[in-house]
Amino acid sequence: MLPTLSVFFMLTFVLLCFLGILANGFIVLMLSREWLLRGRLLPSDMILFSLGTSRFFQQCVGLVNSFYYFLHLVEYSGSLARQLISLHWDFLNSATFWFCTWLSVLFCIKIANFSHPAFLWLKWRFPALVPWFLLGSILVSVIVTLLFFWGNHTIYQAFLRRKFTGNTTFKEWNRRLEIDYFMPLKVVTMSIPCSLFLVSILLLISSLRRHSLRMQHNTHSLQDPNVQAHSRALKSLISFLVLYAVSFVSMIIDATVFISSDNVWYWPWQIILYFCMSVHPFILITNNLRFRGTFRQLLLLARGFWVA
């Protein structure tokens, strides 16, 4: 791979992050304005506000981390900066996965059509429990962050003292800790929200697909507005599922496959890691009437300034 291609991927990564920051910032500003005007937010808006906020700061931290690692490869593992950056990144990453999970659960409860008593009870109680679920997610993320911080602090102390177990170098010892501690910790802490997400999103897709087929059979027309609305909802949910799965798998692979910043695949891999949190906000904006209208006006305004 030529250096120019590496520069291309680096610029693509920066553009992707900035687009994600702008999209998430737009969602947060829209909901903040609504919160100030009405004095409260709907349960769905609470989750979107929390998700947008965590993704906004996560991409800012991730952008700093990627370039700091790229510019300070040698001393990165044992630097104090790694501890500070990782402290914020681990908290925001855990919170983001949990907020995505609650968003999928809320979609499932609001849209899916099941007659099971447990589902009906959850449909009735879940909106009132959303603030507690969000608070619980933050507390869980704090605990997860402390567990990751212990590992990062161990690496930092070992780097300062130059004392490693066995006849190994710091790089080998650091890599062993990544495999034996960080990777299992990531799998355990991320599997719970991912399992909830997968169950709720698959139930919702199944319910929507069954309902869409029933409407197509009754109307005998694919041009019916209700059929088209359900088809759009299905496409949106499937894209959400794919992006979430890519994000989960890439996080796990990132803990097992070490890609150094001097590797030709470093910047393409950063693009994959941040792809979901950059693209999904635009899906949320296009599928929300309030967001879509304001966003279109902003684009037209920006286009007018650009032409002028």
Swiss-Prot record:
Keywords assigned by UniProt, alphabetized: G-protein coupled receptor, Glycoprotein, Membrane, Receptor, Sensory transduction, Taste, Transducer, Transmembrane, Transmembrane helix
Cellular compartment(s): Membrane
Cytoplasmic side: 29-60, 110-128, 208-239, 286-308
Record field: transmembrane: 8-28, 61-81, 89-109, 129-149, 187-207, 240-260, 265-285
Keyword Hydrolase: no
GO biological process: detection of chemical stimulus involved in sensory perception of bitter taste
Function in brief: Receptor that may play a role in the perception of bitterness and is gustducin-linked. May play a role in sensing the chemical composition of the gastrointestinal content. The activity of this receptor may stimulate alpha gustducin, mediate PLC-beta-2 activation and lead to the gating of TRPM5.
Protein family: Belongs to the G-protein coupled receptor T2R family.
Further information: Most taste cells may be activated by a limited number of bitter compounds; individual taste cells can discriminate among bitter stimuli.
Protein name: Taste receptor type 2 member 41
